[in-house]
Amino acid sequence: MNFETVIGLEVHVELKTNSKIFSSAPAHFGAEPNSNTNVVDWSYPGVLPVMNKGALEFGMKAALALNCEISKETHFDRKNYFYPDNPKAYQISQFDQPIGHDGWIEIEVEGKKKKIRIERVHLEEDAGKNIHGTDGYSYVDLNRQGTPLIEIVSEADMRSPEEAYAYLEALRSIIQFTEVSDVKMEEGSMRCDANISLRPYGQEEFGTKAELKNLNSMNFVKKGLAYEEKRQAKVLLSGGEIQQETRRFDEATSTTLLMRVKEGSSDYRYFPEPDVPRFSIDDEWIEKVRASLPEMPASRRARYISELGLPEYDAMVLTLTKEMSDFFEATLANGADAKQASNWLMGEVSAYLNSEKVELADTKLTPENLAGMITLINDGTISSKIAKKVFKELIENGGDAKEVVEAKGLVQLSDPAQLLPMINEVLDNNQQSIDDFKNGKDRAVGFLVGQIMKATRGQANPGVVNKLLQEELSKR
């Protein structure tokens, strides 16, 4: 029997506000444990939460970017559960009236585009963090407690781990462009839980789902879902039943392990939060937030294709992250050709970032310097081969491209008066290659060009070398 995979994702995104959602404590990553807290975060008796308007508007902004409808009337609820990192024994969240609902985003997998529906976007506060020490004690850090979150809940529209990965890529890109979050999974500002079930092809009713946690990267999401897909199929084919449960992804083995039997919403005993008033959102407020939205990735992609003439693949890669897209735009603003800038960013720049595991902002490369280097290639000052040496210097140490070329003596040799003596010396030492050329063996020219480039340490202009070489060969 063949099964259809059904996947839905719940993505938590930390909002990049200066303070927390219900307290005035800072909401910054990386501080000393329990240094970004106050009495609200510690849940002292008698203290009351105060809604952060900026967090609310960030939530609206994200929901609008995800094509959601904004709820005109909304409120917060208490989600009751006990855990050491949750001093109130409840979380302030939204249950039946989320800030946004009925949205969608478009993904593309293997050339096929598909809309993934978004059920809801709701606001909530984050919990603290438990730290289990090697001394046998567990510690609680409440810096994260009260950090504003949005939870983005998709419909179960994805049918493969690859579609789930594409959805996360598209979602991360959209949220990055809104600038409400930096969506860094490695820092915990974007976290994903996945729900997966199988059903026989043709069956409308969903199968019993498992929820996957500890998915700390997009690759782990894909690996966890791929394993769970196989595990559930094996259980069903052997006549067993899938249990509704929560499972943890094990990074070492790329498998999923049972954590607990899955709770339902009734286990959390939701009820309206009495300490945070209900609030209304009118059309004027919605349109004000909508007007603050920047150009979204899909719009930029379309512009790159229609106005700049870039291939669809280039446009897609350049808009995967706001950082790369903004860098590309700034490089063009400094006079670079669009296709050349795209090639460098997708090629040498991306390769360097991947190998060094850094982001563009961590390097010394600037749009001005990249554009300057491209100009030097186009005016013949340096060759593409020399440009790679210049690029390495620019991205590691910075500086002006022209100054780097001059300081390191990398200017391309194009003067016939300089090149002809070297060309003739190579010809004098390679009579066999001359004979091969005269006998119609074209590869002899390639060999001779290689020898000339070697003699000039790669600094000769290949076009000029070819022209002069052909002229000299005709004389012999």
Curated annotation (Swiss-Prot):
Swiss-Prot/TrEMBL GO biological process terms: glutaminyl-tRNAGln biosynthesis via transamidation; translation
UniProt-recorded name of the protein: Aspartyl/glutamyl-tRNA(Asn/Gln) amidotransferase subunit B
InterPro entries registered for this protein in UniProt: Asn/Gln-tRNA_amidoTrfase_suB/E, Asn/Gln-tRNA_Trfase_suB/E_cat, Asn/Gln_amidotransferase, Asn/Gln_tRNA_amidoTrase-B-like, GatB, GatB_C_1, GatB_Yqey_C_2, Gln-tRNA_amidoTrfase_suB_CS
Recorded GO MF terms: asparaginyl-tRNA synthase (glutamine-hydrolyzing) activity; ATP binding; glutaminyl-tRNA synthase (glutamine-hydrolyzing) activity
SUPFAM superfamilies for the chain: GatB/YqeY motif, Glutamine synthetase/guanido kinase
Keywords of the record: ATP-binding, Ligase, Nucleotide-binding, Protein biosynthesis
EC number: 6.3.5.-
